[in-house]
Amino acid sequence: PGVKLPDFSQFGEVKREAMSRMMFATANNMQRSWLNVPHVTQFEDADITDMEDFRKAQKAAGEKKGVKMTPLPFLLKACATALAELPQFNVSLDMERKEVVRKKYIHIGIAVDTPNGLMVPVIKDVDKKGLWELAAESAELAQKARDKQLKPAEMQGACFTITSLGGIGGTAFTPIVNTPEVAILGVSKAAMKPVWDGKEFQPRLMLPLSLSYDHRAVNGADAARFTTVLSQLLGDIRSLLL
């Protein structure tokens, strides 16, 4: 049931304005997902010290290519590998037919913060693309989202979503699953932390990851495996490049 609002004008001056179509659609989708999906969030920190060193070393190559290498392509590749290794995350539930729809493709949505609200363009076949191709495509789609130039087909077909607040701040959050997907990865701001290496504490750049998932489709042990795979991949840049 909806929540009946009081007359706020009795408390002070107010102004009413119509919701944009995007805001109304997003609100409906969020409410539908939250009401229908039993959410659980698994948290993990990934050591991205070496990854960041490698990424920053690509600055000159990026200038030649006209592409900026951000952390997002690494996250995309890591998620694509994890989805391939743990295919129970690459499904949708058809509750009416009592069936699990298993997808043989890996398309990943990237949440983009725009002046007009949140938009989620989709990168197709992430598992078949290299880091530079993913960097170029994600930048192009994000710009199209900000310019309100995305086509409907460019926002459809995702198996999984990545939403990042790392450029703003925060240490963890619970992203809402974008149903009919069954999982979404939230990325917070990386920070230097002391990490014990067996002999002494070392300063390491740690990236907080928050994996929300549909507990009907995914159990807790598999969620822990998924974030562990992500942490291992992001912590060893060689594994992502193979």
Predicted regions mapped to residue ranges:
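C-terminal catalytic/motor cores of large multi-domain enzyme assemblies
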Residues: 1-242
